[in-house]
């Protein structure tokens, strides 16, 4: 039962819980960038050590899986922020509305989109290009590389579509 004074306590408890989830997701999302870079370095090391360009096909798979995870976390981070902005439970909590109104937000989001595309899509496409320019490869690997290129294109499209929806 809610009594006088209790709604503010409930709103504060909800806010703390939601913000804790958002912070956890931000940490996960940020760490995914580092994990991706390490995974790319590992795949390139294996490719170089094995003297086989076929291992380059690991890069798009890794960046695709981690990119989707990154995008899903980013979506939830944005959804939490939107919820807190649109359902203000406590007076005086202006950060959630003031921060997104920053006039440089659009340029920051554009730069972030470019970084995301290079990290999660460009690196995979670079590996695929190196694979395609190598000596002739078995048809099954070529077919796999085409599927990876399509999947990477879909991921890039999702990053762009999502950025357009949230940058406004």
Model feature map: region roles:
Residues 117-132, 142-160:
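Hydrophobic core of alpha-helical transmembrane segments in multi-pass integral membrane proteins
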Residues 54, 59-105, 156-168:
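Inner-leaflet juxtamembrane helices
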Residues 1-43, 159-168:
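Cytosolic-side membrane-entry/anchor segment at the start of a transmembrane helix
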Residues 41-48, 66-72:
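Membrane-helix exit/interface motif
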Residues 50, 131-139, 160-167:
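Transmembrane helix-loop junctions in multipass membrane proteins, especially transporters and channels
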Residues 37-44, 61-63, 122-130:
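Hydrophobic, membrane-inserted alpha-helices
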Residues 26, 97-124:
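Loop-to-transmembrane boundary segments
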Residues 49-60, 135-149:
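Hydrophobic alpha-helical transmembrane segments
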